[in-house]
């Protein structure tokens, strides 16, 4: 079947409320509020509610712990400002992928998409949904651990539901994100206000001598920063959907400037609230810090905490799915994945094949269950690609002076972020060397085999296999190649 023009087949444009003529491509459905909600909703998952102790464990006192949380927020903001320059200079979806392509060529871009799409993003999606499932199941299995099969089935159902919602409508996906972000901000506000009230009542014992017993070694401080910045991961999510942002030149930087400082303030104030009712030792021993806080402060309404933590995790999962599907779509459009993964639903105008592919890979990761170590070992790879991308920003200042830059950050900002990236790449390897890091590097480099076989040389036998797959999936899912918007 030839890839016929979709203009004759577009019959259901009523699902997209606009008087402008539509092409079968991703539509600009995401405004400033939705952009802020994507950033906030994706960064704030379950970690700050369940286990904000990773930073404290490495600093061993309250004062340095709060300073690290604030410093990590500043660094995340600096990194996001660099991505704002990139996103307004190269207005393509896909996050780091188009920037690496423009700065260094197809091979680094392919290795990024290979690593992200096969390991990092679907495994993170699976972990978030498993966390959601465990919190929901806990309400029905009081006093005992829920069966693993039940947890996995509920997590798989959550993945299917989120994938379906985002495949049905961009607008519906963004509305769901807005609702769950509002829900998590409600519980954040409850914890912060309760903490401030307790602080005003004189619960300041844990803030006295707050630097006593602090760890000052380079190794401990580096691990504290590493864990803190991991909690801020997601600051670049809006760059994955640049093509769907209304007025990206304005809304992308504004969403960053509003969203990340908001998260930073929330993280600092929530930690302060926790320390008003828990000593550092008690916080480190708590299995779920927000639940412990709720039991001590909000009783008999403490049940709202696990409920809203579940809302928070499902919101983070929705934001992750919403943005990651665009990376698959862009990689397919560039010929770095199956071409059908870049196709658009005729009726829904969503990257449905990319989202379905992403959901299937995430469900596969649920089967073994314990994939936290996989994500931990691959997290240094995330900073490898962050650093390469921002290095590309510096390189393009000299090699692509012709590109228009609506936003241009001072050169010291990307240099700082590059140095931090190098530090975060080397810190876990030096402090806790393990063979797994070598395996991660080998996996990343193994993408070169697939690149040269299927992308660079494009062997005929591979095309003979992919063509019937594309043909049947196109008919089954009612999808077509994306068109360019009319100028």
From Swiss-Prot:
The chain crosses the membrane at residues 32-55, 63-84, 111-137, 148-169, 170-193, 218-238, 252-274, 303-325, 352-370, 371-391, 411-431, 435-450. It catalyses: L-leucine(out) + L-arginine(in) = L-leucine(in) + L-arginine(out); L-histidine(out) + L-arginine(in) = L-histidine(in) + L-arginine(out); L-arginine(in) + L-phenylalanine(out) = L-arginine(out) + L-phenylalanine(in); L-cysteine(out) + L-arginine(in) = L-cysteine(in) + L-arginine(out). GO terms for biological process: amino acid transmembrane transport; amino acid transport; L-cystine transport; neutral amino acid transport. It is a multi-pass membrane protein. Outer medulla of kidney (at protein level). Kidney and small intestine. In the kidney localized to the apical membrane of the proximal tubules. Residues 1-23 are annotated as: Disordered. Residues 1-20 have a biased composition (Basic and acidic residues). The keyword Signal does not apply. GO terms for molecular function: amino acid transmembrane transporter activity; antiporter activity; broad specificity neutral L-amino acid:basic L-amino acid antiporter activity; L-cystine transmembrane transporter activity; neutral L-amino acid transmembrane transporter activity; peptide antigen binding; protein heterodimerization activity. Pfam families: AA_permease_2. It is found in: Apical cell membrane. Keywords: Amino-acid transport, Cell membrane, Disulfide bond, Membrane, Phosphoprotein, Transmembrane, Transmembrane helix, Transport. The modification Phosphoserine is found at residue 18. Disulfide-linked heterodimer composed of the catalytic light chain subunit SLC7A9 and the heavy chain subunit SLC3A1. The heterodimer is the minimal functional unit. Assembles in heterotetramers (dimers of heterodimers) and higher order oligomers; the oligomerization is mediated by SLC3A1 likely to prevent degradation and facilitate heteromer trafficking to the plasma membrane. Interacts with CAV1. Belongs to the amino acid-polyamine-organocation (APC) superfamily. This is b(0,+)-type amino acid transporter 1. It comes from Rattus norvegicus (Rat). The lineage of its organism: Eukaryota, Metazoa, Chordata, Craniata, Vertebrata.
């Amino acid at each position: 079947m030839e890839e016929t023009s979709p203009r004759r087949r577009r019959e259901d444009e009523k699902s997209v409320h606009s008087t402008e003529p539509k092409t079968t491509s991703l539509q600009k459905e995401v405004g400033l509020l939705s952009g802020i909600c994507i950033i906030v909703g994706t960064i704030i998952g379950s970690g700050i509610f369940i286990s904000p102790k990773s930073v404290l464990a490495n600093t061993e006192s309250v004062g340095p712990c709060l300073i690290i949380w604030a410093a990590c927020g500043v660094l995340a903001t600096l990194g996001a400002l660099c991505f704002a320059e990139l996103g307004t200079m190269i207005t393509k979806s896909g996050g780091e992928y188009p920037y690496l392509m423009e700065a260094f060529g197809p091979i680094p871009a392919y290795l990024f998409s290979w690593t992200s799409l096969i390991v990092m993003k679907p495994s993170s999606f699976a972990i978030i949904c498993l966390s959601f499932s465990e919190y929901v199941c806990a309400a029905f299995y009081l006093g005992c651990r829920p069966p693993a099969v039940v947890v996995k089935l509920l997590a798989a159902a959550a993945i299917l539901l989120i994938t379906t919602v985002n495949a049905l409508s961009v607008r519906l996906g963004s509305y769901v994100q807005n609702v769950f972000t509002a829900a998590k901000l409600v519980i954040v506000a409850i914890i912060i206000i309760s903490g401030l009230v307790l602080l005003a009542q004189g619960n300041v014992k844990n803030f006295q001598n707050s630097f006593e017993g602090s760890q000052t070694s380079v190794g401990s401080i580096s691990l504290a920063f590493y864990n803190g910045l991991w909690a801020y991961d997601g600051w670049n999510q809006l760059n994955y959907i640049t093509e769907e942002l209304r007025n990206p030149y304005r809304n992308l930087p504004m969403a960053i400037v509003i969203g990340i400082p908001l998260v930073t303030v929330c993280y600092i104030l929530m930690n302060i609230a926790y320390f008003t009712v828990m000593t550092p030792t008690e916080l480190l021993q708590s299995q779920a810090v927000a639940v412990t806080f709720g039991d001590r402060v909000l009783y008999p309404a403490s049940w709202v905490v696990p409920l809203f933590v579940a809302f928070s995790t499902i919101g983070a999962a929705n934001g992750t799915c919403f943005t990651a599907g665009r990376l698959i779509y862009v990689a397919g459009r560039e010929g770095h994945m199956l071409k059908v993964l870049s196709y658009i639903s005729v009726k829904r105008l969503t990257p449905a094949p990319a989202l379905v592919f992403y959901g299937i890979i995430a469900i596969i990761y649920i089967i073994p269950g314990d994939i936290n170590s996989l994500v931990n070992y691959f997290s240094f790879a995330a900073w490898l690609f962050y650093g390469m991308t921002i290095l590309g920003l510096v390189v393009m200042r000299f090699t692509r002076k012709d590109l228009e830059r609506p936003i241009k950050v001072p050169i010291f900002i990307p240099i700082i972020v590059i140095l931090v990236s190098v530090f975060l790449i080397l810190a876990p390897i030096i402090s806790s060397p393990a063979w797994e890091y070598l395996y991660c590097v080998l996996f990343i480099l193994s993408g070169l085999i697939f690149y040269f076989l299927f992308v660079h040389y494009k062997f005929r036998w591979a095309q003979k296999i992919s063509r019937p797959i594309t043909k049947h999936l196109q008919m089954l899912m009612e999808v077509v190649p994306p068109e360019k918007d009319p100028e």
